[in-house]
Swiss-Prot record:
Family to which the UniProt record says this protein belongs: Belongs to the non-disulfide-bridged peptide (NDBP) superfamily. Short antimicrobial peptide (group 4) family.
Functional note: Antimicrobial peptide.
Compartments, as annotated in UniProt: Secreted
Signal sequence segment: 1-21
Prodomain residues: 36-69
Designated name of the protein: Peptide Ctri9594
Gene Ontology biological-process entries: regulation of defense response to virus
Tissue specificity note: Expressed by the venom gland.
CC per GO annotation: extracellular region
Primary localization class, coarse: secreted
Keywords: Antimicrobial, Antiviral protein, Secreted, Signal
Additional note from the record: Shows a low ability to inhibit hepatitis C virus (HCV) infection in Huh7.5.1 cells.
Source organism (scientific name): Chaerilus tricostatus
Domain of life (superkingdom): Eukaryota
Amino acid sequence: MKTQTALFFFFLFSLMVATQSGVVDTLKNLLMGLLSKRALRNQNFVEYAYDPSLSAADWRALDTLFENY
């Protein structure tokens, strides 16, 4: 009986902390941000990753700069 009471109060306290700190709202907003129509529709951000103006020497220089970063 002591274990059940301790677990009950632990989960009750956890629920109170989660609702007061806004964890549930943060998780909901994160999921909606990842799964919303706008997020699913806006998948063309990868197009900007390729820059044809950079030469092989530029890529090597960038590689050496970020080698120890």
